[in-house]
Amino acid sequence: MATLLVIMVLALVSVGIGSFQCDRAAERAAGQERAFMAGDAVVQLEIRNGSGIPGLAADLSLILGRAGATAALLANADHDRYQHSLLVNRRLDDASAHALAARLGGLPVLMEFDPAAAADAVLILGNDHDRIRTALLTTESVH
């Protein structure tokens, strides 16, 4: 009987810890969302196609407004073999860059600060570009 009681207590504690971690993750995401939405300016993105699919950057640029961004420049990446898309942060604060990356499907963020850059960030499209389209089409518009 004592063993059963110990197992039940351990189960309740582990469920509580798991829900606490989920709550903390949700709070972090909400904080990033608030940080992103706090800025009045639309984020200027340079979109570089690294997937080899012709016209992909132009296609995705049409729905970027849903993430509070607009395309400042469309171009090809340095090569067309990017397996994974990523966001290169040039001028955004860290919280805004990560909030934008979350709205674009949870992309990794690479920091290459350049205050003289023409765009706030560079979106490099890789072979996993569908996750960006899905994220943009299934989220509420920011602006």
Can you say where each PLM-predicted feature lies in the sequence?
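Generic detector of short, locally flexible boundary/turn motifs and exposed helical patches
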Residues: 10-12, 36-38, 50-54, 85-91
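Short low-complexity stretches enriched in small and charged residues
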Residues: 2-3, 39-46, 76-83
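N-terminal hydrophobic targeting segments that direct proteins to the cell envelope
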Residues: 16-36
